[in-house]
Amino acid sequence: IINFILVGISLYEYEKVCECLAGDFAALPGLVSKHWLANEENNTYGGVYIWETEEAMQNYLESELFHGVGANPALANAESKEFEVIEALSEITRGI
């Protein structure tokens, strides 16, 4: 899960930029899904990523895409937290 705030751009502008990047994320090896998050009232945005393997996630964290997005000054105070999926419970609730 990654969270950040927007600095100097609106939600609309952010969405337009992300539309251009969505295909790059979709092409990432091992990415099962990415859910884009927004809370305009609190100026908090981010994403929930589901990976096939920890190796796929680590490859993303070392990629040009990750570092390029992270270097964008409009995305400030970025925080990333890693979690493991509890498979048995997630299956019950139709998780991926």
Model-derived regions, located:
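A generic short-segment signal for beta-strand/edge and adjacent turn/coil regions
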Residues: 2-5, 13-20, 47-52, 75, ...
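Short amphipathic alpha-helical segments
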Residues: 4-33, 64-69
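Glycine-rich beta-strand-turn "strand-cap" elements at beta-sheet edges
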Residues: 6, 37-41, 69-96
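Residues that cap or initiate secondary-structure elements
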Residues: 8-10, 55, 86
